[in-house]
Every structure is written in C-alpha cells, then in structure tokens.
C-alpha cells in the first residue's frame, strides 16, 4: 500500500488547484475579450458569475478525465511493452477517458470562444457526451457495475443542472444570443450585436 506524507498530499493538492485555477484565470481573461452576443441594461451578460462557475465545473471534470487518461496510458505502455497480445484490451480501457477529455474540451472551448446559439448547443451536446455517456461507456468497457451513488448518476445530475442553467438562465441567453436573449435585450432597450447598450 502506498502512503503519502503530509507534504506530498499538500503538494498534490497544490498542483491540482494550480491545474484548475490557472486555466480558470486564463479563460476568464480570454472570455471577457469576446463580447456577449446581446446586451441588456441591468442584466448581467458575458462570461462571469454562474456561467464562469459552470465552465469551472467542466474544467474540473476535464482535468479529472485527462488525469485518468494519462494514468491509463502509462499503465497501457507498461502492459504493451510486456506483451502485445493485450493491445486491444489495454487500448479499450483508455477510450472512455479519451472521449471524455475530447468532448469536455470542446464544450469548454464553445462556451469560452463561441458567441452564438450554435456554440451553446454544441457545448450542451458535448457536455452530455463527455459526462454521463462516457461514464456509461466506462461501465461497458471496464465491466463496472452501475450504482445509484456512483459516477454515472453523479455526472447525470451535474449535467442536467448544467444543461438547465445554460438553456434557461439570462446570462447564457445574452452571452450566446439565443432567441430568449434577443427578446430580453429588445425588451430592455439593449443591443443584439454585442455593442454596448
């Protein structure tokens, strides 16, 4: 059994926090350079608040998937170096985490750089593909049982909450210029082209 000292645990926590906070800071700076698709006086728009928190949740999920993918790739290299007979079974174990990383990074990119309803739709679809669907793939490929308090259920709940927020809240509607965001901007005397109202 592996035992970690307090300093090692603190270092791992600091590295994980840095791996999350540094991209969040960079994403906030980059995302604020791209104006929201619509503006309405008195209503927050652009990447910030709960929308930034939603992106942070997706970043945490993506960092976790990338970590598991990297760990599985290291184990795969070790097993393949011993015998190439196990190439496909070993590669199979990496497919879910690779898919999760891929789709979650697309969702994050769409939310940060996109300012259209299509970008919002792509982010929602990729969040579903990178979250619960990949967790179900993991149970299929790795033969893990589906438990009520397990990963697929938790990711399903998180993805439902994220989807409801992205589709029905005012900030994402204004940021990505959905029909409800354009109506809100028009009703408040704002603009629908990203210019300051």
Locate predicted features:
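Short, strongly hydrophobic alpha-helical membrane anchors
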Residues: 1-7
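Hydrophobic alpha-helical membrane segments
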Residues: 100-103, 119-142
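A loop-to-helix transmembrane entry motif
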Residues: 84-101
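Hydrophobic core of alpha-helical transmembrane segments in multi-pass integral membrane proteins
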Residues: 13-26, 101, 105-108, 132-136, ...
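Juxtamembrane "helix-exit" motif on the non-cytosolic side of transmembrane helices
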Residues: 66-81, 134-146
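Cytosolic juxtamembrane helix and N-cap/initiation of the first transmembrane helix
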Residues: 3, 17-67
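Cytosolic juxtamembrane helix at the C-terminal end of the final transmembrane segment
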Residues: 24-45, 108-123, 162-190
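Non-cytosolic membrane-interface motifs at loop->transmembrane helix junctions
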Residues: 144-154
């Amino acid at each position: 059994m592996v035992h970690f000292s307090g300093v090692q645990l603190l270092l791992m926590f600091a590295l994980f926090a840095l791996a999350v906070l540094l991209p969040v800071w960079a994403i906030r700076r980059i995302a604020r350079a791209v104006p929201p698709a619509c503006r309405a006086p008195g209503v927050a728009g652009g990447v910030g608040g709960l929308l930034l928190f939603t992106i942070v949740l997706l970043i945490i999920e993506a960092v976790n998937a990338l970590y598991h993918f990297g760990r599985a790739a290291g184990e795969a290299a070790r097993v393949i170096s011993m015998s190439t007979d196990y190439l496909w079974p070993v590669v199979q174990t990496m497919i879910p985490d690779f898919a999760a990383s891929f789709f979650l990074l697309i969702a994050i990119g769409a939310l940060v750089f996109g300012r259209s309803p299509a970008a919002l739709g792509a982010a929602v679809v990729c969040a579903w593909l990178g979250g619960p669907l990949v967790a179900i793939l993991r149970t299929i490929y790795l033969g893990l049982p589906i438990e009520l308090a397990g990963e697929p259920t938790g990711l399903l709940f998180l993805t439902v909450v994220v989807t409801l927020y992205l589709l029905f809240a005012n900030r994402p509607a204004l940021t990505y210029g959905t029909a409800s965001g354009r109506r809100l901007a028009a009703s408040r005397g704002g603009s629908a082209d990203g210019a300051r109202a």
